[in-house]
Curated annotation (Swiss-Prot):
Gene it is expressed from: Trex2
Pfam families: RNase_T (PF00929)
Binding site for Mg(2+) 1: 14, 16, 193
Name of the molecule in the record: Three prime repair exonuclease 2
Residue positions binding substrate: 16-17, 122, 193
Length: 236
């Protein structure tokens, strides 16, 4: 198996959606932070020595009104509802969203590595479903990194698989608290979770960059979460 291409830009991604995978969810919010590799290799710190987000950073956050209703739990966790999104005049995941995403990604130096926490089980398959419904694609050399198995794998290597390591929680909130002794802000908003994810990545940047270089998965190998119904064309 050949190694993935060395990514020059890392695009940190989070989705908020209408429910869990078994509910055939639809995306209601997406947020992306694009960071050049050089900014991850040389993290910035404030006067107190605390990690801060890179100064050169592209952001994109979009809300959209899905056709499927939110589960009660998803609405409670995300603070989003079909009613609030409709009231604010938000369309669904359509051709305009795809063109915006593609334009955002085209501004970044490639190859691009998409980064999400639990991405292989949720964010990447769901994004793949929405894109497939519209017949849309990402750049062919795009790769993906899921920080959940990556951080577990790195810790397992350091601890030699001890029982204590197996009891650790790897939720975003638990990782952030473990690394920074604080609670993350704006949890379960897409942008808030991407902010948290990027700081977690910066805390382990050398190891995670090396992991990505060796084990990132090609976007072409991501399977959709479910077979989407026929939707509107990209002209929508």
């Amino acid at each position: 198996m050949s190694e993935p291409p060395r990514a020059e830009t890392f695009v940190f991604l989070d989705l908020e959606a209408t429910g869990l995978p078994n509910m055939d969810p639809e995306i209601a919010e997406i947020s992306l932070f694009a960071v050049h590799r050089s900014s991850l290799e040389n993290p910035e710190r404030d006067d107190s020595g605390s990690l801060v987000l890179p100064r050169v950073l592209d952001k994109l956050t979009l809300c959209m009104c899905p056709e499927r209703p939110f589960t009660a739990k998803a609405s409670e966790i995300t603070g989003l509802s079909s009613e609030s999104l409709m009231h604010c005049g938000k369309a669904g995941f359509n051709g305009a969203v795809v063109r915006t995403l593609q334009g955002f990604l085209s501004r970044q130096e490639g190859p691009i590595c998409l980064v999400a926490h639990n991405g292989f089980d949720y964010d990447f398959p769901l994004l793949c479903t929405e894109l497939q419904r519209l017949g849309a694609h990402l750049p062919q050399d795009t790769v993906c990194l899921d920080t959940l198995p990556a951080l577990r794998g790195l810790d397992r290597a350091h601890s030699h698989g001890t029982r204590a390591q197996g009891r650790k929680s790897y939720s975003l909130a638990s990782l952030f608290h473990r690394y920074f002794q604080a609670e993350p802000s704006a949890a379960h908003s897409a942008e808030g979770d991407v902010h948290t994810l990027l700081l977690i990545f910066l805390h382990r940047a050398p190891e995670l960059l090396a992991w990505a270089d060796e084990q990132a998965r090609s976007w072409a190998h991501i399977e959709p979460m479910y077979v989407p119904p026929d939707g509107p064309s990209l002209e929508a």
